[in-house]
Amino acid sequence: MEERFKKQVYEVAKLIPHGRVTTYGAIAKALGYPNHSRHVGKAMGGCPADVPAHRVISSGGMLAVSGFQERLEAEGLVIKNCRVKDFKKLFWDPIKELND
């Protein structure tokens, strides 16, 4: 995977506000690669500590890593059965946010 792509993924992930979440697919789409959500997931799997990987979840609102539940709950999110409650309300759309 290209280092440039990883850096772009990390830059977008760092913009996700505290208490909000986005998806692998939304980041991929925002970067112009709408079919590369798995590549975003792979990049996030090895991200630096300053990247809030816990705020990037699957398109159905499911946590990809169960260990992220505690970090999201600390930000005020409610997690039930590894799923973010009120996912649609808490969803941060990078395309909308970056174009405003």
Which residues fall in each region the model found?
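Nucleic acid-binding interface residues in structured DNA/RNA-binding domains
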Residues: 1-100
